[in-house]
Amino acid sequence: MDPKLEERARELRTLLQKASIAYYVHDAPILEDSVYDRLYRELQELERAYPELVTPDSPTQRVGEKPAEHFPTVFHRIPLYSLENAFNPEELEEWQERLLRVLGRAPVPDSRTEGELEYVCELKIDGAALALTYIEGLLERGATRGDGQAGEDITPNVRAIRSIPLRLATADPPPVLEVRGEVYLALAEFERINQERRSAGDPPFANPRNCAAGTLRQLDSRVVAARKLSFFAYALHWPEGWPAGDPPQTQWQCLQQLKELGFPVNPLSQVCRGLGEVIQFYERWRGAQLPYASDGVVVKLNSLRLQEEAGFTQKFPRWAIALKYPAQEVPTRIRAIVASVGRTGAVTPVAELEPVPLAGTLVSRASLHNADRLRELDVHIGDTAIVRKAGEIIPEVVGILKELRPADAVPYSLPSQCPECHTPLVRPPGEAVTRCPNPECPAKLRGQLQHWASRDALDIEGLGEKRAAQLVESLGVRTVADLYRLTPEQLQGLEGMGSRSSQKLVQAIQRSRQQPWERVLYGLGIPHVGVVTAQILAGHFPTPELLAQASAETIAQIYGIGAEVAEAVVAWFAEPAHRRLLQELQALGIPALPQQENPAVSQILAGKKFVITGTLPTLSRQQAKAWIESRGGKVTASVSRQTDYVVVGSDPGSKLEQAQQLGIPLLTEAELLALDPTVESGDLHP
C-alpha cells in the first residue's frame, strides 16, 4: 500500500468529519456542498479501490448496501424515562413546590419572580427519542426508546443520519458514553417527502413526528439517508467514569460538552433563574415560527447534584417537566355517542365525530370521560363539540357550542346496563368511573386477553383485538388460563385462521409459558401495577405466593411503591376468582420460576445511597447494583455528600479519591455483603 494513499484517505476523512461538525453543530459551513460532494466521492473511490483503507468512522460507512431483516431488542443501560406534563404556569408552580419539598427546601414566596432554583429550558422537539452508545469514542449502538427499559437496535439507520457523529470529537473519550437526543424531520424536508409521495400516488405522512419515527424503523438504511433526518442531543451519561478533568456538574455544562464532542445541540436552550424566567422563555417561543415542530418547553433542574438528590418517580424524573403549549382545538359535530367497556369494566362514553384534522391526524372519535363530565357539558347527539388532544395524544371533548345546537339534538346519558352483557352498571362510592361488575363481561374478557398478550406482558404474537374477540365469542375463552388449552384444530374453525396460522398462534401461546414472573404480574392487570412496578414487586416477592401473603404495610415500605399501589395489590389477591386464576396458571407452569426460589429479601439498605467503582472480585457491576437495590438501597453514578457508601474494587477510578476527600465510608465486596446478616456464605442472589 502506497503511504501517500493512506495519508490522503486519512486527510479526507478528517476534513469531511470536520466539515460535518461545522455544518450540523455550529451552523457554520467550511465547505461548499459541491466541494464536499467531490471530496466525498474521492474518498469513496479510494476505499473502493483499496478496501483496507475503510475505517468504521469513515463518512462513507453511514449507509449500508443491504436492508436489515429485523431489529433486535436491546436493553438500555440507563433507562429512558418519560416526562411529566404541565399545561399551564400554575401546574408548573405546583411541580416546583413538590420539587422543593423533595429537596428539603423552603417554598419561595413568589416562585414566578424570585425563584432560587436554576433551570435549563430546552424546546421540546416533536420527534422520536434516540439512545446512542459510544465505546472508546466510536459509535457502538443506536436504539429507539421503546418502553424506556428496552428498545430496538437500529444502528445501521443511525449511522445514516449525517448530524450524528460516528466518532467523538475528542482525543480522550470516556470508556463508555451514553447520549440521549431527539431525531426529527425539518418542516421543509417533511414537505418535500410528502410532495414526492403524492407524485408517486402514495398517501402522505400525517405529521413530521410520524414520518421521523417510521423512517427510523425502515429496514433499508438507504431510505433513512434519503429522508435527511436531523438530530438534537440533550443528555449524556458516563457510567464507567470520566476521562481526565472534572465531569460536567450542570445540565448546561452537559449541553456544552455535547457540542464539544461533535453533537448538534438546540441553540435556543437557555439557563433560567426561577420560574419567572422559565415562563418568559415559554411565552417567547410559544407559537413561534421554527424550522421544526415543537410542542412545548422542557424544564430541567440545572444542578446534576440536585437532580440526583431529587431522583425519580416510577415514571418520571422529579427534576424535569414538560410545559406543553396549549393544545390545538377544533369544532366538529357529534354523530353518535357509544359506551365503551374496558378490561377493568370501566365504562367510558365516546363521541363519534364527523372526521376532522387535529394535530396532524384525522380524528373521528373522542372521549367524554365519565357520567359527571357528560352532565357538566350537557352533551347532546348532534351538538357541535370543541375537540382537542389531551397531552397531544388522546382526543377529548372539552366544550359544547350550545348556540349551534340543532332543534333535533338528542340528550345523552350513560346507560344503566352494560352495553356488552346487560349487567346493571355500578358506580363505587367516591369514584367518578361507572363500572360493569360482571367478571364474565365479553368486553372485559377481550381486554384482559389483549393485555395479557401485549408486548410488555406475555408477548404473544398474533393475539390482537380481532383474535381476542373471536376467542371469547366463538371458543368460549373466559380467562387467560384458557388460552393454554387451545388446540390448532379449534382455531382453524375461526374466520381468517388456516392450518399454518393456527399452529403459529398455539406455538406463540405455549412459548409464553417461559415468561418470567414480573411479566406475568404485569399481565394480570392489577390496578396501578405498570411495567416498572411489576419489576420492583417481582424482585421483592419472587413467587406469586409470597406476594399474595404480603400485607399492604409491607408492600408500601418498598422503595418506589406507595400506599395506593400496595392496597390495590392486596385487594386484587383477596378476590377468590383471582386466586383461582393463579392456581390454574401455576398448574400450567406459569410463571416460569427458578428451581430454587429465593426467600423474600430484607430491606436493610432502605434509603442508603451507594456508588460502585473498580472491578469487584466475584460480582459484576450489574449484579452488585441488583443486590443493593433488592434490599432497598440506591446506586448512583457519582459521589456526592449524600452518598452513604462507596464500594471499591480493583483499579478504582476518581470516585475513590472523591470519597476519601468527602470522608465517605469505603466498602470491599465482602463488607458490602456483610451489611445484610441474613446472607449466607456463597449466597450472592439479589
Swiss-Prot record:
Give the source's domain of life in one word: Bacteria
Q: Tell me the Pfam families matching this sequence.
A: BRCT, DNA_ligase_aden, DNA_ligase_OB, DNA_ligase_ZBD, HHH_2, HHH_5, Nlig-Ia
Q: A Gene Ontology biological process annotation?
A: DNA replication
Cofactor needs: Mg(2+); Mn(2+)
Give binding positions for Zn(2+).
418, 421, 436, 441
Reaction it catalyzes:
NAD(+) + (deoxyribonucleotide)n-3'-hydroxyl + 5'-phospho-(deoxyribonucleotide)m = (deoxyribonucleotide)n+m + AMP + beta-nicotinamide D-nucleotide
Q: Which PANTHER family match?
A: CHROMOSOME TRANSMISSION FIDELITY FACTOR 18, DNA LIGASE
Question: Its biological function?
Answer: DNA ligase that catalyzes the formation of phosphodiester linkages between 5'-phosphoryl and 3'-hydroxyl groups in double-stranded DNA using NAD as a coenzyme and as the energy source for the reaction. It is essential for DNA replication and repair of damaged DNA.
Name of this protein: DNA ligase
- Organism, by scientific name, is Synechococcus sp. (strain JA-2-3B'a(2-13))
The record's gene field reads ligA
